[in-house]
Every structure is written in structure tokens, then in C-alpha cells.
From Swiss-Prot:
GO terms for biological process: nitrogen utilization; uracil catabolic process. The keyword Cytoplasm does not apply. GO terms for molecular function: hydrolase activity, acting on carbon-nitrogen (but not peptide) bonds, in linear amides. This is Putative carbamate hydrolase RutD. Gene3D superfamilies: alpha/beta hydrolase. Its EC number is 3.5.1.-. One of its GO terms (cellular component) is membrane. Belongs to the AB hydrolase superfamily. Hydrolase RutD family. Involved in pyrimidine catabolism. May facilitate the hydrolysis of carbamate, a reaction that can also occur spontaneously. Residues 14-123 form the AB hydrolase-1 domain. It catalyses: carbamate + 2 H(+) = NH4(+) + CO2. The gene is rutD.
Amino acid sequence: MHYELHGRMEPDAPTLVLSSGLGGAAAFWLPQLPALTQDYRVLVYDQLGTNKSPANLPAGYSIESMAVELLELLDTLGIRRCHFIGHALGGLVGLQIALLRPQLLQSLVPINAWSSPNPHSARCFAVRLKLLHDSGPAAYVQAQSLFLYPADWIAANSERLARDDAHALAHFPPTMNLVRRIEALLAFDIEAELPRITTPTLLIANRDDMLVPWQRSQHLADNMPNAQLALLNYGGHASSVSDSEPFNQILLDHLAEQCGQVAAA
């Protein structure tokens, strides 16, 4: 898989692993890199079957498959401890890693994530799949911002979104890869295993997320023994892009607290 390392490169530098959502792109995290790379080594990567990590994803592809692929990359790079930050699908990957290899994680930050299928989100993804199958990639890409951002932000950033749409269409993944990634996130269900996740966890959610109800993060916080919730009022599903400054500050505060606790121990 394509990956990039940014920030501090000393062997003892605290390491952050950032995992993006359905689009799978390392570039999703560009609004966070200036804030995070001052004090941390930051790994971003293109998930398999997306962007610069071409592959034909097999039938039965799952969130666990994605977690295992990332663990193999981290093993290759010699990363044995990290703080994991994942957006939506990337948050599910982090939750899966917390079950597969809890000793890897110093802390976990799932953003607008969930633990089991939700009828509202399933309806949204069904609409996106229908757009893809019936109208093609251009319609799918054009509709994407409606699920990701607040209406006023979309109106104020129309030129930027036009550029983003053109880039997304030019780099659109194989249709079956996208279908299998959506199927994987819709099938994800670790409800019965939540009490096993004891990694220090900060859940970040947005009240105005129209794709994933913020109550899904509240549910995670209520059912994981070492988790808390930070709830933002504005920014939509991708507030890390649409309102990055308060989002970044929440991350920095969390990481400072976690790294301080490690140093004290």
C-alpha cells in the first residue's frame, strides 16, 4: 500500500496512524498535517484498492481485511505502538485493530463511527450505490458532498468542490472495489465485543452529520469501558475538512493528555 510519513522522524517520536473513510485517501488528512506534524510522526496511507494502492478487492472483503492489511504495513515499518485516528470507515478499522491487536494502540480516536449496522446510514449508502449503478461515477461524485458537508459550507465552497469533484472523477476507483468497500462497512458488527475494547478512546462526532447519526458515537462511548465522547455542533460528516481548526484542537488536546500520561507512567 502507498504510505507517507510526515513530521518527526526520531526513533522515540510518538507515532500517529491516520486512516481515512470510504474514499481511502491519504490526502484526506491534509488539513490535519500542519497541526500534527510539529510534535508527532504521522503515517497516512491510501487504503488497498483506492488511489495509489491499486488492487482488485475480492468477494467477502471486510473491515477485518482492511485491518489486517494495515497491520502488515505497520509490521513492515516496525511500528509497534501508535495512536490511531480513523474517520468513519477508518474508525471501524481502528476498532477492529483494538480487538485484533490491542497492545499496538496507545489510544484510539474513531470519528463519526459506529459498531453495527444502522438503518439511517444503510439508507444513505443504498442511495449512493443506486446512483453509482444507475447514473455512473459522475453522479456519485457530485452527490458525495451532500453527505459530507453542511449546506452553508457547500454553498460557500462551490469552486473548491468543483475542483475536488473533477479530481475524484479522474481518480475514481474500479466500481467493484467501491461496492465491496461499502458492503464491508455495512456488514461491520462488533456490538457484542465492545466491552473488550479497553484502549483509551476518544470518540468525535458531529450533531449535524447527516450520514452517521451522532448517537452512534454516544452508543460506543456508553458501551466501551475506557471511552469518552467529544461532540461538535458544526462541520457535518467531514468536519476535519469543513471546520478543521476546532477539530484539530480536540485531537491535539487528546494526544497531549495521552502522551503526558505515558510519560508520567
